[in-house]
């Protein structure tokens, strides 16, 4: 999980929780192009709250957090693979 302490300090300094949510929402939008898309389930099953960006699809943890692909799967997004696929 990423360190969001910088956003906590920023939100505290402005006295506004909305700053944190705005930054997290922008992060969510910016990251979407790098989220694997076969049928769009991982991208569509995500949300932002004041604790971070969350992906709820069953394979999200294996794909995004552990950087391991479940056996027999091939998730890819054009332009995100090392070989430029």
Curated annotation (Swiss-Prot):
Superkingdom classification of source: Viruses
Pfam families found in the cross-reference section: Minor_capsid_2
Protein name (database record): Uncharacterized protein ORF6
